[in-house]
Protein backbone atom coordinates (compact mmCIF):
# COMPACT_ATOMS: atom_id res chain seq x y z
CA UNK A 1 0.00 0.00 0.00
CA UNK A 2 1.52 3.27 -1.12
CA UNK A 3 1.17 6.56 0.68
CA UNK A 4 0.04 9.27 -1.71
CA UNK A 5 -0.85 12.19 0.56
CA UNK A 6 1.79 14.39 -1.10
CA UNK A 7 0.66 13.50 -4.62
CA UNK A 8 -0.33 16.80 -6.24
CA UNK A 9 -1.19 15.37 -9.66
CA UNK A 10 -4.82 15.48 -10.83
CA UNK A 11 -6.83 12.39 -9.85
CA UNK A 12 -6.54 9.56 -12.36
CA UNK A 13 -10.24 8.73 -11.90
CA UNK A 14 -12.84 11.46 -11.42
CA UNK A 15 -16.52 10.68 -10.91
CA UNK A 16 -18.97 13.56 -10.50
CA UNK A 17 -22.72 13.13 -9.88
CA UNK A 18 -22.83 9.84 -11.78
CA UNK A 19 -26.26 8.29 -12.26
CA UNK A 20 -27.36 5.18 -14.14
CA UNK A 21 -30.83 3.66 -14.35
CA UNK A 22 -32.40 0.55 -15.80
CA UNK A 23 -35.91 1.65 -16.65
CA UNK A 24 -37.39 3.14 -13.49
CA UNK A 25 -34.77 1.55 -11.25
CA UNK A 26 -31.88 3.88 -10.39
CA UNK A 27 -28.90 1.55 -9.83
CA UNK A 28 -26.40 4.38 -9.31
CA UNK A 29 -27.72 7.53 -7.67
CA UNK A 30 -25.64 10.70 -7.90
CA UNK A 31 -22.27 9.35 -6.72
CA UNK A 32 -18.99 11.26 -6.69
CA UNK A 33 -15.45 10.18 -5.80
CA UNK A 34 -11.86 10.48 -7.00
CA UNK A 35 -8.88 8.14 -7.16
CA UNK A 36 -5.34 9.49 -7.05
CA UNK A 37 -2.65 8.24 -9.38
CA UNK A 38 -0.72 5.36 -7.83
CA UNK A 39 -3.34 4.47 -5.25
CA UNK A 40 -4.98 1.16 -4.47
CA UNK A 41 -8.63 2.15 -4.24
CA UNK A 42 -11.28 -0.26 -2.94
CA UNK A 43 -14.90 0.12 -3.99
CA UNK A 44 -17.05 -1.91 -1.62
CA UNK A 45 -20.74 -2.67 -1.34
CA UNK A 46 -23.30 -5.45 -0.84
CA UNK A 47 -24.73 -7.35 -3.78
CA UNK A 48 -27.20 -5.15 -5.60
CA UNK A 49 -25.78 -1.93 -4.16
CA UNK A 50 -24.84 -0.44 -7.56
CA UNK A 51 -21.15 -1.30 -7.40
CA UNK A 52 -21.02 -3.39 -10.59
CA UNK A 53 -23.08 -0.86 -12.53
CA UNK A 54 -20.76 1.99 -11.57
CA UNK A 55 -17.68 -0.02 -12.52
CA UNK A 56 -19.19 -1.10 -15.85
CA UNK A 57 -19.74 2.56 -16.66
CA UNK A 58 -16.11 3.37 -15.82
CA UNK A 59 -14.76 0.56 -18.03
CA UNK A 60 -17.19 1.61 -20.82
CA UNK A 61 -19.29 -1.56 -20.81
CA UNK A 62 -22.27 0.66 -19.97
CA UNK A 63 -22.92 4.13 -21.34
CA UNK A 64 -22.60 7.24 -19.20
CA UNK A 65 -26.21 8.39 -18.80
CA UNK A 66 -25.87 11.31 -16.41
CA UNK A 67 -23.02 13.07 -14.66
CA UNK A 68 -19.33 13.30 -15.53
CA UNK A 69 -16.49 10.81 -15.33
CA UNK A 70 -12.94 10.55 -16.61
CA UNK A 71 -10.30 7.82 -16.43
CA UNK A 72 -6.60 8.51 -17.05
CA UNK A 73 -7.50 12.01 -18.23
CA UNK A 74 -10.01 10.86 -20.84
CA UNK A 75 -13.68 11.75 -20.68
CA UNK A 76 -15.95 8.70 -20.80
CA UNK A 77 -18.39 10.32 -23.23
CA UNK A 78 -15.91 12.02 -25.56
CA UNK A 79 -13.08 9.47 -25.56
CA UNK A 80 -14.38 5.99 -24.63
CA UNK A 81 -11.81 4.30 -26.88
CA UNK A 82 -8.96 6.19 -25.20
CA UNK A 83 -10.32 5.07 -21.83
CA UNK A 84 -10.33 1.44 -22.99
CA UNK A 85 -6.75 1.78 -24.21
CA UNK A 86 -5.69 3.13 -20.79
CA UNK A 87 -7.11 0.39 -18.57
CA UNK A 88 -6.65 -3.29 -17.83
CA UNK A 89 -9.44 -5.48 -16.48
CA UNK A 90 -9.42 -8.71 -14.49
CA UNK A 91 -12.96 -10.00 -14.18
CA UNK A 92 -14.22 -12.12 -11.29
CA UNK A 93 -14.77 -15.19 -13.47
CA UNK A 94 -11.81 -16.93 -15.09
CA UNK A 95 -11.81 -16.16 -18.83
CA UNK A 96 -8.76 -18.09 -20.03
CA UNK A 97 -8.79 -20.48 -22.99
CA UNK A 98 -8.16 -23.87 -21.39
CA UNK A 99 -6.14 -25.23 -24.31
CA UNK A 100 -3.79 -22.29 -24.80
CA UNK A 101 -0.45 -22.14 -23.02
CA UNK A 102 0.49 -19.40 -20.58
CA UNK A 103 2.77 -17.83 -23.18
CA UNK A 104 0.10 -18.05 -25.91
CA UNK A 105 -2.46 -16.26 -23.74
CA UNK A 106 -0.17 -13.27 -23.31
CA UNK A 107 1.10 -13.40 -26.89
CA UNK A 108 -2.45 -13.36 -28.28
CA UNK A 109 -3.46 -10.45 -26.04
CA UNK A 110 -0.43 -8.44 -27.14
CA UNK A 111 -1.19 -9.08 -30.82
CA UNK A 112 -4.81 -8.10 -30.23
CA UNK A 113 -3.60 -4.66 -29.15
CA UNK A 114 -1.08 -4.40 -32.00
CA UNK A 115 2.00 -4.44 -29.79
CA UNK A 116 5.25 -4.63 -31.82
CA UNK A 117 6.94 -8.05 -31.75
CA UNK A 118 10.00 -7.06 -29.73
CA UNK A 119 7.99 -5.07 -27.18
CA UNK A 120 5.43 -7.85 -26.89
CA UNK A 121 8.00 -10.57 -26.17
CA UNK A 122 9.89 -8.41 -23.70
CA UNK A 123 6.67 -7.57 -21.88
CA UNK A 124 5.70 -11.25 -21.65
CA UNK A 125 9.03 -12.06 -20.00
CA UNK A 126 8.63 -9.16 -17.56
CA UNK A 127 5.13 -10.19 -16.55
CA UNK A 128 5.89 -13.88 -16.15
CA UNK A 129 8.67 -12.89 -13.77
CA UNK A 130 6.39 -10.47 -11.90
CA UNK A 131 3.67 -13.08 -11.26
CA UNK A 132 6.20 -15.92 -10.89
CA UNK A 133 4.97 -18.06 -13.78
CA UNK A 134 8.26 -18.28 -15.70
CA UNK A 135 8.43 -22.06 -15.28
CA UNK A 136 4.82 -22.45 -16.47
CA UNK A 137 5.13 -20.51 -19.72
CA UNK A 138 4.64 -23.59 -21.94
CA UNK A 139 1.92 -25.25 -19.86
CA UNK A 140 -1.72 -25.20 -20.90
CA UNK A 141 -3.92 -23.12 -18.64
CA UNK A 142 -6.18 -26.08 -17.81
CA UNK A 143 -3.29 -27.57 -15.82
CA UNK A 144 -2.82 -24.47 -13.63
CA UNK A 145 -4.08 -24.08 -10.08
CA UNK A 146 -6.71 -21.46 -9.27
CA UNK A 147 -4.10 -19.11 -7.88
CA UNK A 148 -1.91 -19.46 -10.97
CA UNK A 149 -4.86 -18.71 -13.23
CA UNK A 150 -5.61 -15.52 -11.31
CA UNK A 151 -1.96 -14.47 -11.58
CA UNK A 152 -2.04 -15.14 -15.31
CA UNK A 153 -5.17 -13.03 -15.66
CA UNK A 154 -3.46 -10.18 -13.80
CA UNK A 155 -0.47 -10.52 -16.15
CA UNK A 156 -2.81 -10.39 -19.14
CA UNK A 157 -4.49 -7.29 -17.73
CA UNK A 158 -1.07 -5.64 -17.43
CA UNK A 159 0.13 -6.63 -20.89
CA UNK A 160 -0.50 -3.22 -22.46
CA UNK A 161 0.94 -1.27 -19.50
CA UNK A 162 -2.43 0.17 -18.41
CA UNK A 163 -2.55 3.26 -16.25
CA UNK A 164 -5.42 1.78 -14.23
CA UNK A 165 -6.03 -1.91 -13.49
CA UNK A 166 -9.56 -2.90 -12.47
CA UNK A 167 -9.53 -6.02 -10.27
CA UNK A 168 -12.91 -7.62 -9.60
CA UNK A 169 -12.75 -10.01 -6.63
CA UNK A 170 -9.16 -11.10 -7.45
CA UNK A 171 -8.86 -13.61 -4.59
CA UNK A 172 -12.34 -15.13 -4.51
CA UNK A 173 -12.26 -18.91 -4.18
CA UNK A 174 -8.58 -19.02 -3.22
CA UNK A 175 -7.27 -20.68 -0.07
CA UNK A 176 -5.95 -18.33 2.68
CA UNK A 177 -2.28 -18.93 1.89
CA UNK A 178 -2.77 -18.27 -1.83
CA UNK A 179 -4.79 -15.15 -1.00
CA UNK A 180 -1.87 -13.74 1.00
CA UNK A 181 0.52 -14.41 -1.89
CA UNK A 182 -1.92 -12.72 -4.26
CA UNK A 183 -1.83 -9.64 -2.04
CA UNK A 184 1.93 -9.51 -2.56
CA UNK A 185 1.47 -9.69 -6.35
CA UNK A 186 -1.12 -6.91 -6.25
CA UNK A 187 1.19 -4.70 -4.18
CA UNK A 188 4.02 -5.50 -6.58
CA UNK A 189 1.90 -4.34 -9.52
CA UNK A 190 1.00 -1.17 -7.64
CA UNK A 191 4.64 -0.51 -6.78
CA UNK A 192 5.39 -0.48 -10.52
CA UNK A 193 3.16 2.60 -10.76
CA UNK A 194 -0.17 1.08 -11.78
CA UNK A 195 -3.25 2.52 -10.10
CA UNK A 196 -5.53 -0.27 -8.91
CA UNK A 197 -9.32 -0.12 -8.64
CA UNK A 198 -10.29 -3.08 -6.46
CA UNK A 199 -13.58 -4.71 -5.56
CA UNK A 200 -13.67 -7.39 -2.89
CA UNK A 201 -16.00 -9.00 -0.37
CA UNK A 202 -13.03 -9.67 1.94
CA UNK A 203 -12.86 -6.74 4.32
CA UNK A 204 -9.41 -7.74 5.60
CA UNK A 205 -8.22 -7.53 1.99
CA UNK A 206 -9.53 -3.98 1.58
CA UNK A 207 -8.05 -3.04 4.96
CA UNK A 208 -4.61 -4.47 4.15
CA UNK A 209 -4.23 -3.24 0.58
CA UNK A 210 -6.13 0.01 0.21
CA UNK A 211 -4.93 3.59 0.31
CA UNK A 212 -8.55 4.71 0.17
CA UNK A 213 -11.97 3.05 0.36
CA UNK A 214 -15.48 4.02 -0.72
CA UNK A 215 -18.58 2.07 0.32
CA UNK A 216 -21.70 2.15 -1.86
CA UNK A 217 -25.18 1.07 -0.78
CA UNK A 218 -28.57 1.50 -2.46
CA UNK A 219 -26.82 3.31 -5.31
CA UNK A 220 -25.19 5.96 -3.12
CA UNK A 221 -21.66 6.33 -1.74
CA UNK A 222 -22.29 6.26 2.01
CA UNK A 223 -18.72 6.89 3.23
CA UNK A 224 -15.18 7.32 1.90
CA UNK A 225 -11.77 7.52 3.53
CA UNK A 226 -8.76 5.53 4.60
CA UNK A 227 -9.43 2.30 6.49
CA UNK A 228 -8.23 4.04 9.66
CA UNK A 229 -10.63 6.94 9.13
CA UNK A 230 -13.55 4.61 8.45
CA UNK A 231 -12.89 2.48 11.51
CA UNK A 232 -12.47 5.59 13.63
CA UNK A 233 -16.03 6.70 12.79
CA UNK A 234 -17.28 3.79 14.90
CA UNK A 235 -15.38 4.87 18.00
CA UNK A 236 -12.27 3.75 19.80
CA UNK A 237 -13.56 0.35 20.95
CA UNK A 238 -16.60 -1.89 20.46
CA UNK A 239 -18.22 -3.65 23.42
CA UNK A 240 -20.63 -6.46 22.55
CA UNK A 241 -23.12 -7.50 25.24
CA UNK A 242 -25.87 -10.07 25.65
CA UNK A 243 -28.13 -9.64 28.69
CA UNK A 244 -31.29 -11.00 30.26
CA UNK A 245 -33.19 -7.92 28.97
CA UNK A 246 -31.48 -6.32 25.98
CA UNK A 247 -34.21 -3.74 25.32
CA UNK A 248 -34.04 -2.40 28.87
CA UNK A 249 -30.24 -2.43 28.81
CA UNK A 250 -30.15 -0.37 25.60
CA UNK A 251 -32.56 2.20 27.06
CA UNK A 252 -30.39 2.59 30.15
CA UNK A 253 -27.04 2.77 28.33
CA UNK A 254 -27.79 4.81 25.19
CA UNK A 255 -27.28 8.21 26.84
CA UNK A 256 -24.02 7.48 28.64
CA UNK A 257 -21.47 10.14 27.53
CA UNK A 258 -18.82 7.64 26.44
CA UNK A 259 -21.16 5.77 24.08
CA UNK A 260 -21.14 7.01 20.50
CA UNK A 261 -23.59 4.56 18.93
CA UNK A 262 -25.48 1.39 19.80
CA UNK A 263 -26.19 -1.28 17.20
CA UNK A 264 -28.92 -3.74 18.14
CA UNK A 265 -28.34 -7.29 16.87
CA UNK A 266 -30.41 -10.46 16.95
CA UNK A 267 -29.08 -11.78 20.29
CA UNK A 268 -27.38 -8.78 21.83
CA UNK A 269 -26.08 -5.29 21.04
CA UNK A 270 -22.80 -3.52 20.30
CA UNK A 271 -21.67 -0.32 21.99
CA UNK A 272 -19.33 1.90 19.97
CA UNK A 273 -17.44 3.91 22.60
CA UNK A 274 -15.27 7.01 22.32
CA UNK A 275 -12.85 6.00 25.07
CA UNK A 276 -10.75 3.03 26.12
CA UNK A 277 -13.29 0.25 26.50
CA UNK A 278 -11.62 -1.15 29.60
CA UNK A 279 -12.22 2.19 31.37
CA UNK A 280 -15.83 2.50 30.18
CA UNK A 281 -16.82 -1.06 31.01
CA UNK A 282 -17.01 -0.76 34.84
CA UNK A 283 -19.60 2.03 34.57
CA UNK A 284 -21.64 -0.02 32.11
CA UNK A 285 -21.60 -3.02 34.41
CA UNK A 286 -22.70 -0.84 37.34
CA UNK A 287 -25.72 0.40 35.37
CA UNK A 288 -26.77 -3.15 34.50
CA UNK A 289 -26.18 -4.42 38.02
CA UNK A 290 -28.25 -1.62 39.58
CA UNK A 291 -31.11 -2.47 37.24
CA UNK A 292 -30.84 -6.20 38.07
CA UNK A 293 -30.09 -7.01 34.44
CA UNK A 294 -28.01 -10.17 34.13
CA UNK A 295 -25.00 -10.09 31.80
CA UNK A 296 -24.58 -13.35 29.84
CA UNK A 297 -22.00 -12.44 27.17
CA UNK A 298 -19.35 -9.73 26.88
CA UNK A 299 -16.69 -9.06 24.26
CA UNK A 300 -14.34 -6.08 23.83
CA UNK A 301 -12.52 -5.38 20.55
CA UNK A 302 -11.21 -2.72 18.20
CA UNK A 303 -13.41 -1.76 15.21
CA UNK A 304 -12.66 -3.72 12.04
CA UNK A 305 -13.56 -3.10 8.41
CA UNK A 306 -16.21 -5.81 8.80
CA UNK A 307 -17.78 -3.68 11.53
CA UNK A 308 -17.61 -0.61 9.28
CA UNK A 309 -19.21 -2.47 6.37
CA UNK A 310 -22.09 -3.81 8.45
CA UNK A 311 -22.61 -0.46 10.18
CA UNK A 312 -22.90 1.57 6.98
CA UNK A 313 -24.74 -0.95 4.78
CA UNK A 314 -26.84 -2.99 7.23
CA UNK A 315 -25.82 -5.98 5.13
CA UNK A 316 -26.11 -8.34 8.07
CA UNK A 317 -29.67 -7.17 8.66
CA UNK A 318 -30.74 -7.57 5.04
CA UNK A 319 -29.09 -10.98 4.70
CA UNK A 320 -30.80 -12.30 7.81
CA UNK A 321 -34.13 -10.78 6.88
CA UNK A 322 -34.44 -9.18 10.29
CA UNK A 323 -37.19 -6.71 11.09
CA UNK A 324 -36.10 -3.09 10.52
CA UNK A 325 -36.49 -2.16 14.18
CA UNK A 326 -33.80 -4.63 15.18
CA UNK A 327 -31.31 -2.90 12.92
CA UNK A 328 -31.73 0.63 14.16
CA UNK A 329 -28.62 2.64 14.93
CA UNK A 330 -29.21 4.59 18.11
CA UNK A 331 -27.13 7.72 18.60
CA UNK A 332 -25.49 7.83 22.00
CA UNK A 333 -25.03 10.87 24.17
CA UNK A 334 -21.34 11.13 23.29
CA UNK A 335 -21.85 11.74 19.57
Task: Give each language-model segment a name.
Residues 107, 111, 118-136:
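Conserved ABC ATPase "signature" region
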Residues 140-144:
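Conserved ABC ATPase signature
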Residues 161:
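Conserved catalytic motifs of ABC-family nucleotide-binding domains
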Residues 165-168:
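Catalytic Walker B motif of ABC-type/P-loop ATPase nucleotide-binding domains
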Residues 235-315:
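Short, charged/small-residue-rich alpha-helical element at the C-terminal edge
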Amino acid sequence: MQQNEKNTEPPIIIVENLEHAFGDFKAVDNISFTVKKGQIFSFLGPNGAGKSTAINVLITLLSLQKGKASVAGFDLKRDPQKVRESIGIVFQDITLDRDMTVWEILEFHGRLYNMPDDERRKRIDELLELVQLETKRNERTKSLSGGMKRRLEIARGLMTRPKVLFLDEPTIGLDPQTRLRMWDYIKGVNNEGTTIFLTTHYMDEADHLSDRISIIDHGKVVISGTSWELKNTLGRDIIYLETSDNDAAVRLLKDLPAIRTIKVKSRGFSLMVNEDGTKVLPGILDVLRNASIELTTINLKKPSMDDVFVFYTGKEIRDEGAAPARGLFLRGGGR
